[in-house]
């Protein structure tokens, strides 16, 4: 479905991919966790109906049928389904943000290839530089209660060539005046560390849990690398090595 969307001229020129599936299937050499939803953001503010029509046509070519279309605020959700060969149902959801058309960086293209006994193809996928992907991921970590966001940030900060300064600059760009401060992030993350659902969210999604991954250590890294760059942040020595947790 990712490749079919990227090969469609109308959709390729309008939809830019981001989110967990994009991170693990497109940006990383080896996917580290499972993500079923395909997240996109639009380049323009024109009507959405022609693109939904085109999505239906693309889905039909790969044997999927639209089971639901829903719009909630700035998000349009299109759910596709099909009967799996081994029984059960295949479900894919395309989530499109129709409001955020002002990007921080120029978009890029990354070639993606699928070669299996069922289907093969390749295409250049429109997406964002990894720093901007992590800006969105940092916002998601703050706004929702999903441990997968912390895992993805930890993974990028420890294994990829990302710039904390660029991540926070992109965050400021996307959130404008509503960007959270260091004390707000500190309290937000501290509360989430005490939530069992947040801590175990990643377990059902992970391909193989890295031995070095630890929820507390991941939160410490986020505060040291990104939190320190936010408004009202104390000196790094008051944040590092988990000391930010004792100040809450």
Where do the protein language model's features map onto the residues?
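Structured mid-to-C-terminal alpha-helical surface segments
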Residues: 1-15, 26-34, 38, 42-248
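Glycine-rich beta-strand-to-loop/alpha-helix junction loops that act as flexible
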Residues: 17-22
């Amino acid at each position: 479905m990712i490749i079919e969307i990227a090969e469609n001229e109308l959709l390729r020129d309008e939809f830019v991919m981001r989110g967990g599936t994009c991170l693990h299937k497109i940006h990383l050499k080896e996917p580290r966790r499972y993500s079923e939803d395909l997240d996109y953001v639009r380049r323009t503010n024109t009507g959405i109906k022609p693109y939904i029509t085109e999505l239906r046509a693309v889905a039909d070519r790969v044997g999927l049928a639209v089971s639901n279309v829903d719009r909630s605020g700035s998000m349009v959700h299109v759910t596709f389904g099909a009967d799996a060969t081994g029984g059960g149902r295949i479900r894919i959801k395309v989530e499109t943000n129709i409001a955020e058309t002002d990007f921080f960086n120029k978009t890029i293209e990354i070639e993606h290839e699928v070669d299996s006994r069922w289907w093969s193809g390749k295409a250049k996928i429109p997406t964002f530089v990894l720093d901007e992907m992590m800006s969105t991921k940092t916002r998601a970590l703050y706004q929702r209660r999903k441990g997968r966001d912390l895992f993805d940030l930890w993974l990028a900060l420890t294994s990829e060539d990302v710039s904390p300064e660029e991540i926070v600059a992109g965050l400021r760009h996307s959130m404008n005046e509503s960007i959270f401060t260091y004390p707000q992030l500190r309290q937000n993350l501290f509360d989430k560390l005490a939530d069992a659902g947040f801590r175990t969210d990643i377990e059902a999604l992970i391909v193989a849990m890295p031995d070095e991954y630890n929820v507390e250590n991941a939160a410490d890294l986020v505060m040291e690398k990104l939190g320190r760059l936010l408004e009202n942040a104390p000196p790094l020595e008051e944040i590092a090595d988990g000391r930010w947790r004792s100040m809450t």
